[in-house]
Amino acid sequence: YVWGGLKETKAEDMNKKWSSMANSIISIDYLGGKCQSARATLGDSGNSINFNWKENEAICNANFVLAGISLSFKMKLEEDHLTIEVLQNTVKELKNNKLQSVWILPFLGTVKEDTTPGYMFVPDGSGALIRYNKKGTYTSVYDERVYGKDASVDGLSEAGDLIAKRNNDYMIDTQKATIPVYGVVHGANQNAYMAVIEEGAEYSSVYASPAGMVTDYNWVSSRFDYRQAYSYPVNKSGKTIMTTQDEAEAYNGRVTFYFLSNEKADYSGMAVKYRELVKNAGILKRNEREDKEIPMYLHMMAGVVEEGLIFNGYNKLTSVKEAQDIVDNLRRNDIKNISVSYEGWQKNGISGHKYGTTSLDSDLGNEGDLKELHKMLGDNGGRFYLYTNPVSFNEDQARIASTSALTISKNYSSYTRSNTMLMYPTEYYAHPSDVVDSLADMVEDYPEYNLDVAKVGNMIYGDYSKNEKISRQKSKQILSETVSKIKKDKVLENPNQYLWNDTSEYINMPLQNSQYMYETDS
């Protein structure tokens, strides 16, 4: 089976710009004057590429003449897969233009409308299929950053109506892409490929365009972002100008395309192949614990802050003794395999405790009571987890100026909910170094306890603070290393793929996709 882009060099139903991109191994986006983005492809007039072959691999030198940008990439063909890797240290910017993004084989396996049966697979939440149909009218493509948005670059806010005082219960945020894969199927159980983003995933996005969105073709691709354009404040009144990162992010973008056929050529075959890959890489290991009974997960809220007229109060919800009674009652009803996560146990409870504190609120009980609850669950085959959120805090939990990471625009990294009736509609994200210190304190003060670690599992963000500039790539590395050092069991919520190996209990796995109009299956 021959995989390619367009059947024709110049498609009659596609303009020259898109036709050139569809027939290019790689294309680039670059930033010119006034930070305006433009695209260059190898099919554009004047651009060139040469290949240096050696057995089953080649070094390809691409020169985008009009853009004034050149780079090299490596292609290697082995058995059932093809790997393409952008060599970042070969990038040359000969004019004032700066490299923004690189697209790898953007139209590989493209299908015009429904001329071929099949679908595109995207890592949207639980995974989504976009079946080939006649062209439709859509307002957006699927364009999601792998491992979620970056709070240091992307504005984070909750989906909601602009005219409402509170959030719309029928509107949901888009699902995250926690796995760096996508794929294409040409006829179920006939031919397919699965693309795995192996390097640079934290800076990549999966982009899928259904027929009718710009062109009549269905196509999916990975895009590697090397620079961001952003608004930069120039005075205290809030005036901004558009600018771009001076230096590109330093990484090689690498994608491997695994070609599948016959009974393996569908989304189930992709899942089996990916499971094989992550098992062989040590990312996914068999859990040594074998449960004879289906485990029950209980998330208990110990206490919560209560808004007051002058001073905030505290509302005790579940004391340690009451938690023991709940567990004992379940045990007497023959439910023994219980995992309990205890949130708000620190002084002043949920949203009220100081960031990083590890002291138990005395209204809930004492450390002896906590140890008794821990032992009770363990003796009956269950687990007890202390809930900790080292990532985010509100304005009363810490000094924003000293604790919050900064965005590339020098604003505080934050997430704002549209519900203005909330006590704390905005939460801030701590410096990655503070996240590490907070987790280290928890491990030191409670060495015998398992931890329910909130948000670390599916959030990575850079920090552009003056004295602590940390890239998204570096943040991923240090947070992963910190989690791996926690030797006790850990609960992680919908964790990104790189933390699967350090996850004892996986909670809140997505059961659906974002339900875009063009997504046909979940």
Predicted features and spans:
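An active-site-proximal structural segment forming one wall of the substrate-binding cleft
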Residues: 266-267, 273, 277-278, 319-322, ...
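Carbohydrate-recognition beta-sandwich/jelly-roll modules
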Residues: 1-317, 324-338
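Aromatic- and carboxylate-enriched substrate-binding clefts and catalytic-loop regions
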Residues: 337-522
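Conserved aromatic-histidine-acidic binding/catalytic patches
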Residues: 74, 262, 311-318, 322, ...
